[in-house]
Amino acid sequence: GYTEENGYLKLVYYDWTDPIESNITRLMAKIDEVKNATGASQVDLIGHSMGGLVARAYVQSDGYLARDDVAHLITLGSPHLGASKAYPTWEAATLYETLPEEYHQLAILWNFIARKNTDILFELRSMIPSIQDLLPTADYLDLGQLVTGYLYDDTENDALIPEAHMVHQNDYLTDLYMGVSSL
């Protein structure tokens, strides 16, 4: 790993509730901080999960073209095609399946409140707009706790729900994917 003797490591925190695009500015500031501290003209980025999407979005952004300050980009566990569990949360404020087990009681209460208050969906989308950036960009199959990468509609002979038929689309990741040749 990195040590002071053989390299420079800087952790970059981001607000996971903010849209990916909003986190790019924070990443750029940290890159500038590292370049100023080390004298390097380029940095290596390693991003996990949504952090990988933030790093990728930066490298594919117009702002990056003028800077060209990333030598290598590595993403680990980043949902480049979206995340199946984001869809029920964004579409219906359903949180049970998306939370760790220790929060299931809270999620049950949340789901009860969501059924009683239609404004809860508006509130969720306002408080955590990043969920929209994580919506699936392909057909998904979700069998409860057994997520296989596809949304699944078991009411129609076990047919997949095509991404095109989902009420909400993820234009952000789709557009990012269209620019993948810039990587």
Give each language-model segment a name.
Residues 20, 54-55, 82-85:
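Extracytoplasmic/secreted cell-surface and envelope-processing proteins
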Residues 60-183:
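Helical cap/lid subdomain of alpha/beta-hydrolase-fold lipid enzymes
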Residues 25-28, 56-60:
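Short, hydrophobic alpha-helix immediately C-terminal to the catalytic nucleophile
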Residues 1-41:
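Active-site catalytic motif of lipid deacylating hydrolases and related acyltransferases
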Residues 42-47, 76:
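Short beta-strand immediately N-terminal to the catalytic nucleophile in serine-hydrolase-like folds
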Residues 46-47, 51, 55:
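Gly/Ala-rich beta-loop-alpha elbow adjacent to hydrolase catalytic centers
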